[in-house]
From Swiss-Prot:
It comes from the Eukaryota. Disulfide bonds join 65-109, 159-168. Inhibits alpha-chymotrypsin at the molar ratio of 1:2 in state of 1:1. Gene3D superfamilies: 2.80.10.50. Residues 1-24 form the signal peptide. Belongs to the protease inhibitor I3 (leguminous Kunitz-type inhibitor) family. Pfam families: Kunitz_legume. Keywords: Disulfide bond, Protease inhibitor, Serine protease inhibitor, Signal. This is Chymotrypsin inhibitor 3. GO terms for molecular function: serine-type endopeptidase inhibitor activity.
């Protein structure tokens, strides 16, 4: 009984500590100024108009269905709703934590909705997998606030796990392939700069 009470108090304190009464500069905040919900669904949009639309999937190469993560060429498209999840038990994404990103409505041939990074002719690229993945292969992203922006704009870091540490020293950017697909790839230059727009619940149904 005591252990149950202690656990309940611990969870309550964790929830209260992440209530959105105020935000700090390093909090992960959406386009409307609200803290980003852990497990919530959002559109990842360019903060500068005319740089393309939101993030979606495309079928490339010999893929049986759209497994390549790309930016929509349609500037008025929000793309697909994306779930943002942390490994921590909290209502909101903890500051500076690694996150998993996954499509709320993934394609049928994907074994998992979560993004991962795989080798490709264009270099390491963001894809969906046809196989189940371990946690270390999906908790590989981190949002970094753009310091020169006075609004909530973020770069997306790619993080690699080794035996003792996690290294986050590369970014996610865009590579346009010969078919015009704006693929998300790992890069050290010209990272994506994104704003997070909360998706409506009826649009972002979970599979």
């Amino acid at each position: 009984m005591k252990s149950t009470t202690f656990l309940a108090l611990f969870l309550l304190s964790a929830i209260i500590s992440h209530l959105p009464s105020s935000t700090a500069d390093d909090d992960l905040v959406d386009a409307e100024g609200n803290l980003v919900e852990n497990g919530g669904t959002y559109y990842l949009l360019p903060h500068i108009w005319a740089h393309g639309g939101g993030i979606e999937t495309a079928k490339t190469g010999n893929e049986p269905c759209p497994l390549t993560v790309v930016r929509s060429p349609n500037e008025v498209s929000k793309g697909e709703p994306i779930r943002i999840s942390s490994q921590f038990l909290s209502l909101f994404i903890p500051r500076g934590s690694l996150v998993a990103l996954g499509f709320a409505n993934p394609p049928s041939c994907a074994a998992s909705p979560w993004w991962t990074v795989v080798d490709s002719p264009q270099g390491p690229a963001v894809k969906l997998s046809q196989q189940k993945l371990p946690e270390k292969d999906i908790l590989v992203f981190k949002f970094e606030k753009v310091s020169h922006s006075n609004i909530h704009v973020y770069k997306l870091l790619y993080c690699q796990h080794d035996e003792e540490d996690v290294k986050c020293d590369q970014y996610i950017g865009i590579h346009r392939d010969r078919n015009g697909n704006r693929r998300l790839v790992v890069t050290e230059e010209n990272p994506l700069e994104l704003v997070l727009l909360k998706a409506k619940s009826e649009t972002a149904s979970s599979h």
